[in-house]
Amino acid sequence: MMMSRLSGLARRAFLAVVYSTSGAVAVSLIVFVVYMNGRPDLAVWHLVDLDEEFSSDSKIDSFAGYVALEERVFKQLDELVYAKISPAQRTQVNRYHRGSLSDPQRWEPNWNRTFELRKPDPRVGVLLLHGMSDSPYSLRQLGQRLHASGAHVLGLRMPGHGTAPTGLVELAWQDMAAATRLAMRHLAEQNPGRPLYIVGYSTGAALAVHYALAALENQALPRVERIVLLSPAIGVSAVAAF
C-alpha cells in the first residue's frame, strides 16, 4: 500500500515537471516569435547579391582584371542598392543614400575602393591590406604618408568589402589570398628591382604573413623585403614561448 502510494506521488511529480517544462518552452517560443516578428525587416543592402565580386575561382589573372571587376561590382551596388532604397531610408546618415553625409561616393577618391598612389621614381613598393569587415579607408592616411615619403602605394580592397554586408556571406580566406597575390604581382611589375613591403592590419596582417611564407616556397611569387603587422589577427600558441 505504502509503495503504491509513493509510486503514485512520484508519477504525479514527474508529470508536473514535464508539463511545467513543456509550458515554459511553449511560452518561450511564443515570446521569441513575437519578438522576431516585431523586429524591422531586412533592408535591400542586407539581401542584395553582388555576383560580380572576385573570388579565387574567378578567371582573373591580372590586377587590371581585378580592378575592372571591382568597377563592375560597384556599378551593381549603384543599381541594386543605391537606386532601390525606399524614400524613408533616404536619410543623411544612410551610407546608401546618394549624397548623404556618410555616402563614401561624396569623396574623391572613394576610399572604400582599391587605390594606387604612384611615384615617378619610387624608393619602394608598399601593399596595404585592411582588416575583416573593413575597407582601404582605414589605411588611407598611412598610405598617403608613405607616398609622400617616396613609396609607390597600393591599397587593396579585399573581395566582399566596402560594398554591402552580404558581400561577406560567402567570402573565404582563399579569395582574399588570391587577391593579395594579384596585387603583389602588379606591384612588382610596376617597381622592378625595388624592395616590396606589405603593411597588414588585423586580418590583413594574417594575409601578409601567409603571403610572405608562400613566397618563400613559391619562386613565382614576388618576394617581400619586410612585412609590418598592425594589431595582427594571429593566434600564437603557448609553445612558441619555448
Question: Where do the PLM segments sit?
Answer:
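Catalytic nucleophile-loop/oxyanion-hole region of alpha/beta-hydrolase
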Residues: 163-197
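N-terminal targeting or regulatory segments adjacent to alpha/beta-hydrolase or S9 domains
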Residues: 2-105
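Active-site signature of alpha/beta-hydrolase-fold catalytic machinery across serine-
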Residues: 210-214
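Alpha/beta-hydrolase active-site loop signature
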Residues: 160-163, 234
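Gly/Ala-rich beta-loop-alpha elbow adjacent to hydrolase catalytic centers
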Residues: 199-204, 208
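Short, surface-exposed "cap/lid" segments of acyl-processing enzymes
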Residues: 105-161
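Active-site nucleophile loop of the alpha/beta-hydrolase fold
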Residues: 228-239
